[in-house]
Structures are given as structure tokens and as C-alpha cells.
């Protein structure tokens, strides 16, 4: 094919199109790979998979590559986190936005930085709802069981091409909060890696 230009458009829920980037040059014969993502479908997917893991009493672990996919994977990660801790965002979403919390940055940013910017009562309320979500949801896979760092603490802590081979070698298991391995539902929401 001939050299050409492409653009990236966003279509909102009302059908209004906004050009996000135009003038992307493609060389003759160059191949472009693109995808469309539905936020609603993604969030429904996470909810369904979390519920299934809870019903089957297995861990849940998220596997992405936010270090390389610097736009899409942190956003996907943010939705994984905000669905898991949905009660927190339902009650304190506006207050968390006021202290510039973005779930794409992980749970550690909330716990270690943003909570300090909330008043004491709200900070305690957020912590309480986090604990309620931990109790209501399936157990989360751990990056570091000794330090209490879950799979949702940092978007770049679970790199799919390192984490999934470890899960496969462990017969489909991942580390739990006590440092032992347990059967896990490995969620790979990025289609680039989902064929694993």
C-alpha cells in the first residue's frame, strides 16, 4: 500500500467524535495495529471475573505490561483497581479526585500519598472501605507477601512476560498474602498477551 496518514478518534457515549491525534504518518507497506476498547465492557469483565474467583475461592491476579504499554495498560490497570475497590470510589470518588488521586497509579499512591491529603475522618473512611473490599472480593495475588504489596499496588509491578511464565511453572498458582502459592485466576485484559 501507499504511504498515508491516520488519526486517532474518540467517540463518546453520545456519538460525538473528538480527534485525539492526527497526522500520524505511515510509510508505504507499514502495518499499524490498533484496537478499540469499551470502558463499560472492560469494567463488566473485571466485575464478572472477580465474582467468579470469589465464588470459586481462588486468588485473582492481574497481568499487564504497563512499563511498555505506557498509555493503555495503566488505564486498564486503573479500571481493574477501581472495580476491585468499587465501594471506595462510590463513596469517596469526588474527594479522591480533589487530592488528585488517579487509580492508574495504583493502590500504593492512594495509601502512601493521597490519604495524607484527606482530612482524618475521610482517610479513615477510605481505609475502612478498602478493608471491606478486601473481605468482599477474592484474595489478591501478591507481589511481595512480606511487605503486603498486592497485585494492585503499582501498575508496573506485574510484567506479563515475566509473571505468566511463573504462574505456568507453578501449575496455575500465584503467591497469596501468607507467602504460599494458591490457584489463581490470571486476568490478562490486554489482547496482545491474552493468547497465553
What are these regions (language model features)?
Residues 1-78, 87-196:
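Extended, well-ordered protein cores
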